[in-house]
Amino acid sequence: MILRRLLLAGSLLLATAFTSAKKADGPKISVTKFKDEPVNLFYFDDSDTVMFQDGKNGDVYVSRDAGANWDIVDVSGMRGKAWSLLPHPTDRTKAYIMSKGGTHWVTEDQAKSWREFTVDAELSRYEYPLVFHGKDSNRVMLLGHKCNGLDCKERTYYTTDGFKTVHLLMENGRHCAWAVSTPTFGEGLDLPKEVNDRIFCVVSGLHSSWAEANRLLYSDRFFKDEQGTEVPLDNGRAVSGVIRTASVQKYILAATKSARTNELALFVTDDASTWHRTEFDGHRVEEDAYTILESTSYSLQVDVVSTYSSTIGTLFTSNSNGTYFTRNIEHTNRNMYGFVDFEKISSIQGIILVNTVKNWEDVEKSNGVQKKVISKISFDDGRTFQPLKVGKHDLHLHSVTDATNSGRVFSSPAPGLVMGVGNTGGHLKDYLDGDLFVSDDAGINWRKALDDAHKYEFGDQGSVIVAVFDEGRTDKISYSLDHGKNWHKASLPDGVQIRAKVLTTAPGSTTLKFLLLGSAKADIGMEYYIISIDFAEMEERTCEEKDFENWPARLNEKNEPDCLMGHKQFYRRRKAQADCFIKKKFEEPAPEFERCKCTEEDFECDFNFVRGEDGKSCIPSRSLIAPEGVCKNPDDKFTGSSGFRLIPGNVCIREGGVDLDKQTERVCSETFKNPPAGQIVVEKSFFTADYYKDYFYLERKESSKGEDETVIMITSEQQIFLSRDHGKKWKQILEEEKITRIEPHRFFDDVAYFLTNNGDGWYTLDRGDTFRKFKAPLPPNQDKLPVLSFHPDRRDWLIWTGADECNGNGGNCHSVAYYTTNLGGEWHFLMRYVRRCEFISRDARGSSDKLVFCEQFENENPSNKHLQLLSTEDWFAEKRLHYSNILDFATMQEFIIVAIRGENSQDSLRIGVSIDGKTFADAELPANVQIPIQRAYTVLESRTHAAFLHVTINNIEDHEYGSIIKSNSNGTSYVLSLSAVNRNSRGYADFEKMQGLEGVAMANVVGNVADVENGAAKKFRTMITHNDGAEWTLMRPPDKDSEGRSYACSTKGGKPTDACALHLHSYTERADPRDTYSSPSAVGIMIGTGNVGDYLSLKSKADTFITRDAGITWEEVKKGKYQWEFGDSGSIIVLVPESTPTKTLLYSLDEGRSWKDFEFSEVEMQIQDISTVPSDTSRNFLLWGKEVGQGKKPGLATVNIDFSGLKERSKQCVLDEKKPEADDYYLWEPKHPLQPNGCLFGHRAKYHRKRPDKDCYNGRELQHLDSIGDICECTRSDYECDYNYEPQSDGSCARVAGLEPLDPKLVCTENPKAVEWYEPTGYRRIPLTKCQGGKQLNHIVAHPCPNKEEEFFKKHPRLRGIGLFFVILIPICLAATAGYYVYNHWDGKFGRIRLGETGSGGLFDRDSLLVSIPVSMVAGVVAVITALPLLVSSLWRSVSGYVRVPGGASSRRPYSSRDSFAARRSDYVGVVEDEDELLGTDDFDDDEEGDERNGQV
């Protein structure tokens, strides 16, 4: 124990000491006054040295006599710079003074001396700055950050020698911790040596910075020469979404959370290598809804929030490996900060004091109900609880949630002494209504000690108890020398009267000295006192043997010493009535143990067993594993685990005791759970309704417990059906309610709302397991607008848009918005006359959780049709007007995009864009995309740090099309990505991004635009991009069809042409928009229906195609059009005929290479849809349709197709993260079709994909992205055309005629920290690319920003003086020397020609290889002499490109072609007109004049 008391607040100054020498019958009290409040006060363990920090002026104080006298720590450079004062948690000699900058100080001798150390970073703004090793105090990590302008990176440093040297561990680590973080970690285990060096770090995802992509890495080499190894948390597989890790006793826990759920998964290890997922007896564990409590060396204690209230929990205790948790007590009292009324009595095993909520049912129904809190105590480690008793009355004590002192609330190492403030009666009253109570038998019996609330502390192993009045100001202290039976008072000297803030003593409570911190009013503000209370001078005698008793720490119901963990516990403590002091300073009382015979309580459930419903038996949690070769038949028997094991660390006596872990005979049938049937299983269900109106999956996410696959359906008869097993069995729900619509939560897959027309509603938070009713403030609106708006991060926050004054009599019917933060428990008015209100996500914006945008009719008058866009961060107590007269707004990942009408009806729409939700900027649209009047935008997608918009060009019915424009990274500057993209009358466009792989998208364009403008029907072609819309190409058709025949058209050299390409039916033709080409879990695979030819043909003539390499190559799998669905992350693909009655389906187990027929119905069915869970990870599929053949049954039918029993999919695939290609998986690298080096977005990524020939299943969602390998050099594919530039037929970018690029100097004004600006080149980097070096097409000619010349030239040093002289001279000298040598040694000399000679074959013969270089160099002499004036000119102009030089060129032409640029190095700053000649690239001169006229680069 180091820090038992932590103070909150200010500092000190002034040091005026008053000393009052008390009589022998009272303590000596010394008072020191300070101007500012002390903070971070702590004792060095086993010493009288105390320190605290003046948080106001940055000084640190130290006392070496337990607080009687104080000195400022005066080390060179430290005064006034202390930002925090931190004791080492396990080393009693060390402490750290941290400054805000990079200089800090450490002491290793209890503040006698200090040593300075520096780190090249500021302290972390989000984490505790130091992370300590549990066993080696010299090993510490420091968490900091370093900023370069607005770009800040988290940095983690480490030391292994107590900060004598400091090393960088990693950048951008979100949280790092030592594996050995506690002194007890690994006790009793033979851990490998490398675990002592092991570090765990939570880092961002490879492709995403969102929390759900976080990874947990470890390294045994401080991440030297490695990126770390991903921790296999779940059965050998890595898990994404790691929030953080925590160490408690001998356990390390890791919490993970998947996207779209609040539910967490907790993983635990006790050896830093093998991890297990924890199970909480069927209870959900949610984010910010659990608290890891003080635990033991043999179990973890965790309090988990109850389902519907954040301030009521359930206490769980784990088995010895932390895997299985059982409920101890329900309805524990918590507060909104996660503190729980729970405390273990210090130094005594098994005694726990908790507070619970008596009226929990009422509290869960309404947040306005006041909790009635009662106290309970357990003497058997939480198995049973009983009330606290003062005589016959129940006692209730204030606990952790409203603690008023630092350190423990009730107890200390003083054996058996427990105190608290509370009251007797039915429940706990206010703190100020409480009295002080004491128990000296560890909580069995209690008595009142003092009237009114007091702070209290124990000293001299309980011989002395000190208390101070805590309901107001006081000038006295109280103390007891007989376990709180009798009390005495002592006055503070010189009339000092204070409001007590902290009463504390040295850790261990073994000294006779106490410290009291208090405040008092001063002439100006407040003043503070530290009061030293010393009982040593009372001159009591030292206790002798007769003054002690052998006290049993725990008693059972018979008042006999009780056993726990196989032993009884006793303490030798001073008798209450003894008139003596123990005086064993810094020597804590040691317990004595007496072993007991083993009982049932000494055993726990063995691995793979859990407690049965009776709470006594242990039943298998999964199928048992029999010895090899034993179980040949289900009826065979084998000897296996009884289900029990002795709790590790338990020392009970086996002989004569209970023996629950004795092996027992088991039946082999227990080793098979759901034995594979070897075939596909079908379950068909019928409904009275004719068809379904809609269905929704409430998908269980990776971090969610359970095995359910929940589907909810609403039928044409308004019936609601629920299935928890993917449609095998259905049950009707909410039968008595008139449900008119179902609203699944947009952001949380566990949640759905069921609404009626009168404002009543129901919701589920657990995927239909339970339902709860709510009442809305108004009926749903009548404007066909969304009724509910959901918060992206806060599950319980809603906005309800209801109808007001809509009584059917004309009236003033309008929509009004209300909000709730507790699932409709309480509603609050937000705004009237609204069209729509939305919560805005804060993740990418750093804004408030309360950021809300609303569209409101101007002047609250719907008739004028003018909508204004308003926002608020305080529920419209204050509001901000962004735009008037808007058309609509949309939110998409990073961007908020607004369509604004012009002032006149003839004006085109404008676009406003914001990233932070506060500041909007007008978007710069490409001039070659004209937006006609009253025509719309469609916001397509923005997951790749750029917004895609479809801008309507032709809005005539059945002739609609438009252009896709793409933004830069802040959404303000748009360029044309693709023209003539098809859309329909509802505004939907034929555009779809591939799921699971960034940057790949497909779109259907109108191929006959000129004809369409004249009234002809549209003809479509399919285009694909592999670099996020920078370049589009037609799709390459297969070489042969599914029957092995060639197509009627042919490609050109394997490349698609206008006359021969693959075209697929797209978004606008789908009956269900959820039926996408691709799946997020089947990486690289897409399926579509279409044809090969010049245009897309009718859908009735379509065939079905597949790609396995993200659209580079395609294969026809079947003639005709099919509906498709992916299962088990693509290891199962199912096809069913579309629009054709059938009783069979097709399935593939090898990514579509081969197909098998399966008959799922005896009667032909018309299948309307095929579905599975949205992640496509299930082995179950659901067909929706009707029977139409002979013997048909009426009504809607669903057919569940279950592949989990199929032999080929009955065994789970093996993935070894260290050897990802060793077993059932291989690493697949996506490629760009136009890049030979395999790079995509500037890097090579590798994805886990199951080997098609392996007979196994993937299981729950696989973390597909394995690694990002080499970072590639930049190429043309990493760039797109800049604003006012457009792509040419050869792929280059040329400026649109008559238009100018954006002012490049704006970067200097928009970013005050910018150092330079670059001349426009026509290119800009794709926001998604990670490339480095190579072609810098966007950064060629640089100029300094105003007043940034000095920083600019540090970044770009100039060549001048002697350096410039030698650059010119050295090539001339080398060429001249070589020429002279060749002239004097070559036998031919210049001008000598000999006909008919065969040559001497000498070293310097003309044919000698060695002559070729000197000849070139001689030729170079002439070239250099000729080029010298040009070289000097070029160098001069290069220098003048940086600064103004008299006579320097004021302008230069850009590179004239991509090829001429490629011939030069990217580190040239300027190039003169004749430099191509100098560098030998005159072969491009023919192109330059024309290219320059076109503005082509």
From Swiss-Prot:
- Coiled coil location: none
Q: Which GO terms describe its cellular component?
A: cytosol; Golgi apparatus; membrane
What domain of life does the native source organism fall in?
Eukaryota
Q: Where in the cell is it found?
A: Golgi apparatus, trans-Golgi network membrane; Prevacuolar compartment membrane
| Keywords tagged on the record | Glycoprotein, Golgi apparatus, Membrane, Protein transport, Receptor, Repeat, Signal, Transmembrane, Transmembrane helix, Transport
Q: How does it sit in the membrane?
A: Multi-pass membrane protein
Which residues does the entry place in the Lumenal compartment? 22-1361, 1430-1497
Region annotation Disordered: residue ranges?
1474-1497
Q: Does the keyword Ribosomal protein apply?
A: no
Q: Name one GO biological process term.
A: Golgi to vacuole transport
InterPro entries to which the protein is assigned, alphabetical: Sortilin_C (IPR031777), Sortilin_N (IPR031778), VPS10 (IPR006581), VPS10-sortilin (IPR050310), WD40/YVTN_repeat-like_dom_sf (IPR015943)
Give the matching Pfam families: Sortilin-Vps10, Sortilin_C
Where do the record's glycosylation annotations fall on this chain? Answer: 321, 970
Q: Could you confirm whether the keyword Repeat appears in this record? A: yes
Signal peptide segment: 1-21
Write down the SMART domains for this protein, in alphabetical order.
VPS10
> Which CDD domains would you find in this protein's record?
Sialidase_non-viral
Residue spans with biased composition (Acidic residues)?
A: 1474-1491
What biological function has been recorded for the protein in this entry? Functions as a sorting receptor in the Golgi compartment required for the intracellular sorting and delivery of soluble vacuolar proteins, like carboxypeptidase Y (CPY) and proteinase A. Executes multiple rounds of sorting by cycling between the late Golgi and a prevacuolar endosome-like compartment.
Q: Which family is this protein grouped under?
A: Belongs to the VPS10-related sortilin family.
**Protein name (Swiss-Prot/TrEMBL):** Vacuolar protein sorting/targeting protein 10
Q: Which organism is it from?
A: Ajellomyces capsulatus (strain G186AR / H82 / ATCC MYA-2454 / RMSCC 2432) (Darling's disease fungus)
